[in-house]
């Protein structure tokens, strides 16, 4: 019996010891693997090496101590893992480094991590962790040096408890949803060197206690935050500060003079704020400063003389302020200056003549000022100058010959000045040149194009000068040119057939010159042409039949020449041609009346005495003869008068009958307010089910047409219910209701939101749509998780939305104009497939070419086509413009308005930054796109710029947009031409060390 009791006692002790024994590190790692989806045992799994049969010290991402018994480092960064972080990670007792960055791990941060008392580095950045930051971490991780939770979904106030981490040197809390104020206790870390709270939703004042961080080297507080007031004077106490980024966070007032104490500062970014007053003199005492961006503020006054002491300055951005006075001569003496951007101010006087003599100048933009004088002669003395922009000033004199030898030059924009003399020889042969804009000057001489030209040149604009001589055949060597604008000059001689070699050409304008001879039929080889203007020349001969080979041509102007012969009837088949002008030539014969000719105005054919047809008079050969040409034009006969009287009487009776019927129907309607469901397909719910959704908590959107609710039907299906604004009885348009019902009720297309049915009680109308769980493109793209929307997904959305609009424009009869195309009206389903939505403003396009209600709204701000301002008319080309804005949003990641200064939208900004040159797309590319197929992005950008052309006739149709997007070039990877290129890191964003955010399709 005693032996039995002894055995029971030993068994109990053994069980107790086993139950209390901590989980082994081996099992902790297996638990971690189980919690992370995408980490299975298949060979393609990123954690496929984590097998029971092998030592965990050999597993990927695992580092052990010398005894190979304990894990000291776990680095699973960038493995595309999802799921949650298992609390069992806390059993890796000797862990010093934990990095799970650049994955898709969600859920809360487990507070159990606090038991890892030896942890020094914790990096959870670029995931989708949510909830509040656990305070337990701050009490347990006493040895923590690095804490990085950048770019997650963490909420609540900024954690105060992290100030207990006295060993902390690097803290990155940016890119989350933290709210509230920066706590004053954030000034108490004794050894911190890096602090980032940028990209949150912080408010209030910047606490003066921040000045106590005397060891701080980098401080990032900008972007999405909206602070009150300006910088506290205590900022000057940060004696070790090297980088300070306070851009775009609502700062006001003047820059405090105490900033001059920051003698180690090399980077100062305060752009896109509301700073005012003069530029602080003490800025010139920052002897270590290399980059200073104070652009997009409201600074006044002149550039301080103290700036002459900034001998290390490489970047000076003061554009978009209210500065005046002369540009000081010492700017040209700064020995390290590489970037100088002073555009959109009120600077006067001349450009410093020594500018560029330091041999390091890379970018100069002095446009939109009031500068006079001549151009500095040695701006490219170091052969590093890439961009030179001086447009919109009062500069005179010649263009320096040295620019014709500047092999580094990629863009030159000197339009809208008073420059004279000839274009420097060699300019068009520069190997990297992509854009030349010299329009609206007084340049003379011949076009200096020899055998060797720049094949990269995408745009040549020489309009409105005094250039003369023949157009050299070597112009055909500009194989990459997209826009060739030579209008308003004195060019003469024939148009060379070599123009047909310009396969990338989309716009050609040779109007207002002295060109003679026939129209070169070879021009038809330029398949991408959308705009051709050869008007006001001395051209002769016949219109070539080959012109019909240009399948996407929108605009063709051959007016005021000496063309003869008949108009080719084959032009009638050019469906894309929307504007044509053959007036004031010597054409003859009958104007075709079929196909596209039925859309052209008769004024397009005036001034051709031998042309005949409608409005032009009868043809000489008697084609128009018949027995219906002679009608009495005298006074009306008695019988005709009687018929008119009887007609009026009948109409009066008819109106009376209609009025009686209408009155009875209104009375009947007022007696019955029952809800009625009209279904466009089989539905498993009733109006009562729909009405149950109309609760405040279910609101998911509000717009001009009404409120949208999320509804759950009895069978579990999700729907979106749009409650339209109350309408007055008898309203002919019912606030968009009739238009939506007539269009959506019969539309079935994969990329258009499906209308399931509608409920009505004669006073209120409810539209029931299929539900789109991922919301709108605008919400996703412009939210803080827009970086997760990778390029492949963006391109897919662009093509799908284009197909939806194409269906409305080309496959509906009559065609449908959306009128409010925008990123918020492109909805995304669970697979991020795009669906065009919101037809509350859609109208049928009548045969007349105008919409049925021109007083209706024509779209949303930032998306409205420019012609609406003076025509008040909307057509399908207005939708094309709006879609082009959406494409620019996808490429740049920016909203259409609100980010570029007063009165500037995304189209104007992109044109300013790239000069509409597709090869400059990297200058505006969304910095959140870390790795992209550059040829695809360039092509989509090219399509976007076609869509937002100023003139509607120059825009492609949506069918052409789909075709061009579908035929996007696919370049094979090679050693010389990589498939992907890294997007340049934004100067405005702090470096986070993060390169590839996850794709939303994998969420």
Swiss-Prot record:
Q: Which Pfam families match?
A: LRR_1, LRR_14, LRRNT_2, Pkinase
- EC number assigned by the record: 2.7.11.1
Query: Where are the membrane-spanning stretches?
Result: 641-661
Function, as annotated, reads:
Necessary for male gametophyte development, as well as ovule specification and function. Involved in cell-cell communication process required during early anther development, and regulating cell division and differentiation to organize cell layers. Required for the development of high-ordered vascular strands within the leaf and a correlated control of leaf shape, size and symmetry. May regulate the CLV1-dependent CLV3-mediated signaling in meristems maintenance.
Molecular function (GO) terms for this protein are:
ATP binding; identical protein binding; protein serine kinase activity; protein serine/threonine kinase activity; receptor serine/threonine kinase binding
The listed locations are:
Cell membrane
Gene Ontology cellular-component terms listed: plasma membrane
Show the InterPro entries listed in the entry.
Kinase-like_dom_sf (IPR011009), Leu-rich_rpt (IPR001611), Leu-rich_rpt_typical-subtyp (IPR003591), LRR_dom_sf (IPR032675), LRR_N_plant-typ (IPR013210), LRR_R13L4/SHOC2-like (IPR055414), Plant_RL_S/T_kinase (IPR051716), Prot_kinase_dom (IPR000719)
Membrane topology note? Single-pass type I membrane protein
Instruction: State which residues carry a glycan (glycosylated).
Output: 80, 97, 123, 130, 153, 164, 212, 237, 312, 346, 420, 477, 557, 586, 601
Question: This protein is called what?
Answer: Leucine-rich repeat receptor-like serine/threonine-protein kinase BAM1
Q: Where is the active site?
A: 820 (proton acceptor)
Its encoding gene is what? BAM1
Expression by tissue, per the entry, reads: Expressed in seedlings, roots, leaves, inflorescences, flowers and siliques.
- Report the leader peptide range: 1-19
Q: Which reaction does it catalyse?
A: L-seryl-[protein] + ATP = O-phospho-L-seryl-[protein] + ADP + H(+); L-threonyl-[protein] + ATP = O-phospho-L-threonyl-[protein] + ADP + H(+)
Q: Which SMART domains match?
A: LRR_TYP (SM00369), S_TKc (SM00220)
């Amino acid at each position: 019996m005693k032996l039995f009791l002894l055995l029971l006692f030993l068994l109990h002790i053994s069980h107790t010891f086993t139950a209390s024994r901590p989980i082994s590190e081996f099992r902790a790692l297996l638990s971690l693997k189980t919690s992370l989806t995408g980490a299975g045992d298949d060979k393609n799994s990123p954690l496929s090496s984590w097998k029971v049969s092998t030592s965990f010290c050999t597993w990927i991402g695992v580092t052990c101590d010398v005894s190979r018994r304990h894990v000291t480092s776990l680095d699973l960064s960038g493995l595309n893992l999802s799921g949650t972080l298992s609390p069992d990670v806390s059993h890796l007792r000797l862990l010093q480094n934990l990095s799970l960055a650049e994955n898709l791990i969600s859920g809360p941060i487990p507070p159990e991590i606090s038991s890892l008392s030896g942890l020094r580095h914790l990096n959870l950045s670029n995931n989708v962790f949510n909830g509040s930051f656990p305070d337990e971490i701050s009490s347990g991780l006493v040895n923590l040096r690095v804490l990085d939770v950048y770019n997650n979904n963490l909420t609540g106030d900024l954690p105060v408890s992290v100030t207990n981490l006295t060993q902390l040197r690097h803290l990155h809390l940016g890119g989350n949803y933290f709210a509230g104020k920066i706590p004053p206790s954030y000034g108490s870390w004794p050894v911190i060197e890096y602090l980032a709270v940028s990209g949150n939703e912080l408010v209030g004042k910047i606490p003066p206690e921040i000045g106590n961080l005397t060891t701080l080297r980098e401080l990032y507080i900008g972007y999405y935050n909206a602070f009150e007031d300006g910088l506290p004077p205590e900022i000057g106490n940060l004696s070790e500060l090297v980088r300070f980024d306070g851009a775009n966070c609502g700062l006001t007032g003047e820059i405090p003079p105490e900033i001059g104490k920051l003698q180690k500062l090399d980077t100062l970014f305060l752009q896109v704020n509301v700073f005012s007053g003069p530029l602080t003199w003490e800025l010139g005492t920052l002897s270590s400063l290399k980059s200073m961006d104070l652009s997009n503020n409201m600074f006044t006054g002149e550039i301080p003389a103290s700036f002459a002491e900034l001998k290390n300055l490489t970047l000076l951005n003061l554009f978009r302020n209210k500065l005046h006075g002369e540009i000081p001569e010492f700017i040209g003496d700064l020995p390290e200056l590489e970037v100088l951007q002073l555009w959109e101010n009120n600077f006067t006087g001349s450009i410093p003549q020594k500018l560029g003599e330091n041999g390091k100048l890379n970018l100069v933009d002095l446009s939109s000022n009031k500068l006079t004088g001549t151009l500095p002669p040695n701006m490219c003395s170091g052969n590093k100058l890439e961009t030179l922009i001086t447009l919109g000033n009062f500069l005179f004199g010649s263009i320096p010959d040295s620019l014709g030898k500047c092999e580094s030059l990629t863009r030159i924009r000197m339009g809208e000045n008073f420059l004279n003399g000839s274009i420097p020889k060699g300019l068009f042969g520069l190997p990297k040149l992509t854009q030349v804009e010299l329009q609206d000057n007084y340049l003379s001489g011949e076009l200096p194009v020899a055998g060797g030209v720049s094949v990269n040149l995408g745009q040549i604009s020489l309009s409105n000068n005094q250039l003369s001589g023949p157009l050299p055949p070597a112009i055909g060597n500009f194989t990459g040119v997209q826009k060739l604008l030579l209008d308003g000059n004195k060019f003469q001689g024939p148009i060379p057939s070599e123009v047909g070699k310009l396969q990338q050409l989309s716009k050609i304008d040779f109007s207002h010159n002295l060109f003679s001879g026939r129209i070169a039929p070879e021009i038809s080889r330029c398949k991408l042409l959308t705009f051709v203007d050869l008007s006001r020349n001395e051209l002769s001969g016949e219109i070539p039949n080959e012109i019909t080979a240009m399948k996407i041509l929108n605009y063709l102007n051959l007016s005021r020449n000496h063309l003869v012969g008949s108009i080719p009837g084959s032009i009638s088949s050019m469906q894309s041609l929307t504007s044509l002008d053959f007036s004031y030539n010597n054409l003859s014969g009958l104007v075709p009346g079929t196909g596209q000719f039925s859309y052209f105005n008769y004024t397009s054919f005036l001034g051709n005495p031998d042309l005949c047809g409608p409005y032009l008079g009868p043809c000489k050969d008697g084609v128009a003869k018949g027995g219906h040409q002679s009608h009495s034009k005298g006074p009306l006969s008695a019988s005709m008068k009687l018929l008119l009287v009887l007609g009026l009487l009948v109409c009066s009776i008819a109106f009376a009958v209609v009025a009686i019927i209408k009155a009875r129907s209104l009375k009947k309607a007022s007696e019955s307010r029952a809800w009625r469901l009209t279904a466009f397909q089989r539905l498993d719910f009733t109006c009562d089910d729909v009405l149950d959704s109309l609760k405040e908590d279910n609101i998911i959107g509000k717009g001009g047409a009404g409120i949208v609710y999320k509804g759950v039907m009895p069978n579990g299906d999700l729907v979106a219910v749009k409650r339209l604004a109350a309408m007055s009885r008898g309203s002919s348009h019912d606030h968009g209701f009739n238009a939506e019902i007539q269009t959506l009720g019969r539309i079935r297309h994969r990329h258009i939101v499906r209308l399931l049915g509608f409920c009505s009680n004669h006073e209120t109308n409810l539209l029931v749509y299929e539900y789109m769980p991922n919301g709108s493109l605008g919400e996703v793209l412009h939210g803080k998780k827009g970086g997760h929307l990778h390029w492949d997904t963006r391109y897919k959305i662009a093509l799908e939305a284009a197909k939806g609009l194409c269906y409305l424009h080309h496959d509906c009869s009559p065609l449908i104009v959306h009128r409010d195309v925008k990123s918020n009206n492109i909805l995304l389903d669970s697979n991020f497939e795009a669906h065009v939505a919101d037809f509350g403003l859609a109208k049928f396009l009548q045969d007349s070419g105008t919409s049925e209600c021109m007083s209706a709204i024509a779209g949303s701000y930032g998306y409205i086509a420019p012609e609406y301002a003076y025509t008040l008319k909307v057509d399908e080309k207005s939708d094309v413009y709006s879609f082009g804005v959406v494409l620019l949003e996808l490429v740049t990641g920016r909203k259409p308005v609100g980010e570029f200064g007063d009165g500037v939208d995304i189209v104007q900004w992109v044109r300013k930054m790239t000069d509409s040159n597709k090869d400059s797309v990297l200058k505006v590319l969304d910095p959140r796109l870390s790795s992209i197929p550059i040829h695809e992005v360039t092509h989509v950008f090219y399509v976007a710029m076609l869509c937002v052309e100023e003139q509607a006739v120059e825009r492609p149709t949506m069918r052409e947009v789909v075709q061009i997007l579908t035929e996007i070039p696919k370049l094979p990877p090679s050693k010389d031409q990589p498939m992907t290129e890294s997007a340049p890191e934004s100067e405005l964003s702090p470096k986070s060390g993060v390169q590839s955010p996850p794709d939303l399709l994998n969420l």
